[in-house]
Curated annotation (Swiss-Prot):
Compartments it resides in: Cell inner membrane
Pathway note: Cell wall biogenesis; peptidoglycan biosynthesis
Function recorded in the entry: Catalyzes the initial step of the lipid cycle reactions in the biosynthesis of the cell wall peptidoglycan: transfers peptidoglycan precursor phospho-MurNAc-pentapeptide from UDP-MurNAc-pentapeptide onto the lipid carrier undecaprenyl phosphate, yielding undecaprenyl-pyrophosphoryl-MurNAc-pentapeptide, known as lipid I.
Keywords, alphabetical: Cell cycle, Cell division, Cell inner membrane, Cell membrane, Cell shape, Cell wall biogenesis/degradation, Magnesium, Membrane, Metal-binding, Peptidoglycan synthesis, Transferase, Transmembrane, Transmembrane helix
PROSITE patterns attached to this UniProt entry: MRAY_1, MRAY_2
EC number(s) stated in the UniProt entry for this protein: 2.7.8.13
Protein name, as recorded: Phospho-N-acetylmuramoyl-pentapeptide-transferase
InterPro entries, per database record: Glycosyl_transferase_4, PNAcMuramoyl-5peptid_Trfase, PNAcMuramoyl-5peptid_Trfase_CS
């Protein structure tokens, strides 16, 4: 294995953060251009998606040049968990709350590009609401100088409350969404059970993206690819929502300029909770909950790896209270780290896998 690995080009063994930024830029712009050249997806009367992607990326990158020093002056240094990978301890003190870079830019640009479309505004408000939960959590962590913010119970209650309000609004304005459409014309009418599934998807997605935010550039990059994928699935029926997703995708790309390895800023819960909440809301509103599941494959695996680790540990506890672990550490990106994968190799692999999932969603929806 070692000889095979050493024969790979250096980029595939240990790419730099700047190389990964370049890779992500090519993937996003290339995908946006590809979508824009599909008349059935992006009719001529709809702005090509690559335009909002590029505009938001540039604006977010510039905005971050002001926000990062501000966060540093406000002493928003990240508290690193001692039980995490030891290599991460050197990251202590890196400013957090980096979601303040891409959320204002992505949401404002998205609503403007969408012409203040009601669907875009609704998803923007959901994204902002989840971001506020994350901001409060980040602020509590910094105020108490510990790694514990608001209680998990309170965080969950707030996440559920936002999901319930959004689902009630959807039930009143778009009751036809209760039928899930799969590939080959297959469909599944769920009736009122759809809203329970939709609410669960929003809360689960928000927490899954939060778990994914553990390596420089990982959550922001995979979130950027996922948002563009969901935006493409929303076309041509939901052009305003699609433009919002494209702007959030581009804003995440601009954020990665500052978050690439070695990161100058972390997104914190401010950004990671908002990513998942916004993705889920966009997928549900556009009637693409099946496509959302496929595109969110990386986030699902991250969440399942944590659930499996905890469940297996509890199930194998002996009389001393010690259990066995399925992984060296969860989520799975930490397992790969402790297995010898460089951070940047993990991030690059996840970017490519996520792109593959987006393309798969196009085929299967």
């Amino acid at each position: 294995m070692e000889s095979k690995s050493s024969s790979l080009p250096l980029f595939f063994q240990k790419p730099s953060g700047t190389q990964l930024l370049g890779l992500l830029s090519v993937l996003l712009v290339g995908l946006a251009v590809l979508i824009s050249h599909q008349p059935q997806l992006n009719p001529s009367n709809i702005l090509p998606l690559w335009v909002p992607v590029l505009v938001s990326a540039i604006v977010a990158g510039i905005f971050g040049m002001w926000i990062v020093p501000l966060l540093r002056r406000l002493k928003t240094g990240q508290i690193i968990r001692e039980e995490g990978p030891q290599a991460h301890l050197k990251k202590a003190g890196t400013p957090t709350m980096g979601g303040l870079i891409f959320l204002p830019v992505g949401l404002a640009a998205g609503v403007i590009f969408a012409g203040f479309d009601p669907e875009a505004i609704a998803v923007a408000l959901v994204t902002l609401a989840y971001g506020v939960i994350g901001w409060v959590d980040d602020w509590q962590v910094l105020r108490l100088k510990s790694n514990k913010g608001i209680s998990p119970r309170m965080k969950l209650i707030l996440q559920i409350a936002i999901a319930v309000v959004f689902c009630i609004w959807l039930a009143l304005t778009a009751p036809e969404l209760t039928t899930i459409t799969f590939f080959a014309g297959l469909s599944l009418p769920l009736g009122v059970f759809f809203w329970a599934l939709a609410g669960f998807a929003m809360v689960a997605e928000s927490n899954a993206t939060n778990l994914t935010d553990g390596v420089d550039g990982l959550a922001g990059g995979t979130g950027a690819i996922a948002f563009l994928g969901v935006g493409a699935l929303a076309l041509p029926a939901h052009p305003g929502l699609s433009l919002l997703c494209a702007c959030l995708s581009g804003a995440c790309l601009g954020f990665i300029y500052h978050n690439r390895n070695p990161a100058k800023v972390f997104m914190g819960d401010t950004g990671s909770l908002a990513l998942g909440g916004g993705l889920a809301a966009a997928g549900i509103l556009s009637g693409n909950i099946w496509g959302l599941l496929i595109i969110s494959g990386i986030f699902c695996i991250e969440a399942v790896s944590v659930i499996a680790q905890v469940t297996y540990y509890k199930a194998t506890k002996d009389e001393t209270g010690q259990g066995k672990r399925l992984l060296k550490m969860a989520p799975i990106h930490h397992h790969l780290e402790l297995s010898g994968w460089p951070e940047t190799q993990i991030v690059g692999a996840f970017y490519l896998i996520n792109l593959g999932l987006v393309l798969l969603s196009f085929i299967l929806t």
